[in-house]
Amino acid sequence: MAKRHIILATVLLTAVVTARAQSEWVNPFIGTSNHGACNPGAVTPNGLMSVSPFNVMGSEMNTWDKDSRWWSTPYVAENKYFTGYSHVNLSGVGCPDAAALLTMPTRGNLQVDYHIYGCEYTEEKASPGYYSNFLANGVKTEVSATTRTSIERFTFPAGPANILLNLGEGLTNESGAMVRRVSDTEIEGFKLLGTFCYNRNAVFPIYFVLRINKAADNDGYWKKQRPMTVEAAWDSDQGAYKLYDAYTDELAGDDIGYWFSYDNLAPGEQLTIQMGVSMVSIDNARENLDKEQSGFDFDKVRQAAEDKWNEHLCKVQVEGGTDDQKTVFYTALYHTLIHPCIINDVNGQYPMMEHGSRKGKKVGVVTSGERYSVFSLWDTCRNLHQLITLLYPEKQLDMVRSIVAMYEEWGWLPRWELFGRETFTMEGDPAIPVIVDSWYKGIRSFPVETAYQGMLKSATTAGRKNKIRPDIDPYNKLGYIPLGYFQADFSGDNSVTHALEYYVADAALARMAVALGKPDDAKRFRTRSLGYKNYYDKEYGTMRPRTQDGAFLTPFNPRQGENFEPVPGFHEGSAWNYTFYVPHDIEGLIDLMGGEKDFLNKLQMVFDEDLYDPANEPDIAYPYLFSRVKNEEWRTWKTVHSLLEKHYRNAPDGIPGNDDAGTMSAWAVFSMMGFYPDCPGDPYFTLTIPAFDKVTITMGNGKKLEIVKEAAANFALQAQSQAMSRACSARIGGKKVKSYRISNKELTEAGSIVWK
């Protein structure tokens, strides 16, 4: 008996010793290749501040360069030339912006041209809230972050050294900055960011305060001078970087920076810098830094960041599966917790939505909770906000409040908001399904009537003055939008895409009207949401654009538009990528296609002939639509399993394309847990076999949901015959499911889902 106790104790001790915190499963290098647009830098959950290695400029040894093409990420795995750390970076986004305020440690003589001071690097390490590398110039670099501040520790060999702040470069399309020396260890200033996704008016300043732990032997500004010719060429600094070592007032310009130089550091001496940022003012940036960091304690900040990540990631516990699957899962969950990000300062101030000044002020104040920004709603309305609602409802409440406040400040609900500016990127009216989904899932402590008025405004305002639905007139009159109304050039006219997004939004708006006791509105918008039928062409069996005379577009190729090829009527996809995108009325689409058999055959063909695009949003829910036909759920299980294995991997290219502010990662999280929200604004989930033997979810309501996969379910996934695949079934709360599409209430109150 004693021997048995010893063995049991040894087993338990081993289990404790070998247990890994969730953050240890995260690989921040996933998504840093294959246009994933993620970066491995330090960030805290939904933090404004992020610190990323910047390796996309300065050398021909780089595979990708920010100035040679449209490039939207500060870091790419294939590149090898490091030019500093960028601050406040976007994650998984397809348009370049931010990623500025570049800090760089160098050795030897002072150089301020990044083509010269940049260098190669090795020994990269990254974990949630931490990144480090070893530079070819002999410096070890480490960075970490809080919500609004960064800390960077540089360990130097003996000899002369420099710390640079480059305000001229970054991913933003804007130029212009200012920096001011405050003391021998502190500088302050701002840089202009913006022109995101071609929107010339989406421009905003970011304010900063930078401190260093040791006064420099020499410090000063730099600015690149304009090149001169003929008589004016007498200036020896013309066309070059000019050092201002005796100038102490503030300096402004386009290509400017600040430097701290040290004559002779001791071997292993560390220089540490901190930076606080704000979208409101320099004073707020300083207050953020004072409140979020005391002293220059790098290890304390790093540990706090790691602890914060573990608090968030532990909401989901998984057992079984491979180590790679666990890494893919927790990295995906990590990526869903980067955007939207907190934009208010520690004092509650935030930049009001553009044009908010018409009410007499530009700065708002939150008195409770947080104000959020970076709402890539065309993407995230499909799954990310549903995930936040399930696991972190207090965050989703603040996000909904932020969205509604933007309507109050600006007059419209946002579509793609960035740092207090509407960028008008992508299509549709996606704030509506986000708000409606949240309401139906119990998030209601926000001004719902105000939100409803915002929904009505974009859904009913006529003409071009409708900022969210500028082509609403034909949509109202005809039930669809013909080519040539939104844009004369058919190749850039996304009429079908626009309308399909409006149908989904209108269906959600109808649900909101039902909840608020407005039956006439509910009927009106539900009817309008069925206008997609005007686009269905039986000849091709797909959605097909119509011209202004009502005829179908001719000639027409339903496959045109693959790989982002321009195509009339559709944005970033072909007709096949959009044909099934009527998730609010799949039953109606089945009838339109001639019945369940034809529907299944067409949907299966999309996957069999590689017409499905796993790297973009329009068809992201397609795998789950098989389950709308009884006894065909097995197709969902096998298709989802196959897509996860093929496109989500523990490697830099382990996301199939742009992560789109966490949307692709949210697809993986839901799919690996075993359920998915297949219709924006509709509080339902479609079940699938999970990737793990057991998933334990601690939901925001405090309840737990256990999802268990028994051996028979694995067999069903691997089975070659339909009969064997169909043999598997799920039980919810001990009862066999009648439908594999269940309500949010059923899911959150189930207690258990067991696959047998």
Predicted regions mapped to residue ranges:
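Accessory carbohydrate-recognition regions in carbohydrate-active enzymes
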Residues: 22-381, 385, 389-433, 439-500, ...
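Bacterial Sec-dependent N-terminal signal peptides
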Residues: 1-22
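Low-complexity, intrinsically disordered or signal/transmembrane-proximal segments
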Residues: 5, 718-722
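Hydrophobic, small-residue-rich alpha-helical packing segments that form membrane-like cores
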Residues: 501-505
